[in-house]
Swiss-Prot record:
InterPro entries recorded: Leu-rich_rpt (IPR001611), Leu-rich_rpt_typical-subtyp (IPR003591), LRR_dom_sf (IPR032675), SLRP (IPR050333)
Name of the protein in its database record: Fibromodulin
Quaternary structure and partners: Binds to type I and type II collagen.
Glycan-linked positions: N5, N40, N130
Purpose: Affects the rate of fibrils formation. May have a primary role in collagen fibrillogenesis.
Annotated source species: Sus scrofa (Pig)
PROSITE patterns with a match to the protein in the record: LRR
Highest taxon of the lineage: Eukaryota
Keyword Metal-binding among UniProt keywords: no
Keywords: Extracellular matrix, Glycoprotein, Leucine-rich repeat, Proteoglycan, Repeat, Secreted, Sulfation
One Gene Ontology cellular component: extracellular space
Length: 147
């Protein structure tokens, strides 16, 4: 479903779905129930859309390993990341902060890309990225003065 003119999340979607490619569309938001029942979904590609908010729509995605929300208009990081998540791509958005201990619920997280956002030191707590599993953390092109 990538490279279309979709303006909203399609549905209902097959519960057996493992990968969902909705990149390069014009989707502006992900309603809380849009991904309900997709417990087998391992990869969700939503990059290059107009998404401003995802709310808690990711909470039920128990098998999700990869989430790509890069090149959107997000100001906040998604609520309730799935515990199986390994790759989170949020570069080229307008994210200005990451909550304290935000990644604690995702112990398998290996890659976090937050480059080209609006992050400042006030928006990052000192323990935000304290994770022993993290292999790559990209915070380039923000307004950070120290880490």
């Amino acid at each position: 479903l990538d490279h279309n003119n979709l303006t909203r999340m399609p549905g209902p979607l097959p519960r057996s779905l493992r990968e969902l490619h909705l990149d390069h569309n014009q989707i502006s938001r992900v309603p809380n129930n849009a991904l309900e029942g997709l417990e087998n979904l391992t990869a969700l590609y939503l990059q290059h859309n107009e998404i401003q908010e995802v709310g808690s729509s990711m909470r039920g995605l128990r098998s999700l390993i990869l989430l790509d929300l890069s090149y959107n208009h997000l100001r906040k990081v998604p609520d309730g990341l799935p515990s199986a998540l390994e790759q989170l791509y949020l570069e080229h958005n307008n994210v200005y902060s990451v909550p304290d201990s935000y990644f604690r619920g995702s112990p398998k997280l290996l890659y976090v890309r937050l480059s080209h956002n609006s992050l400042t030191n006030n928006g990052l707590a000192s323990n935000t990225f304290n994770s022993s599993s993290l292999l790559e953390l990209d915070l380039s092109y923000n307004q950070l003065q120290k880490i």
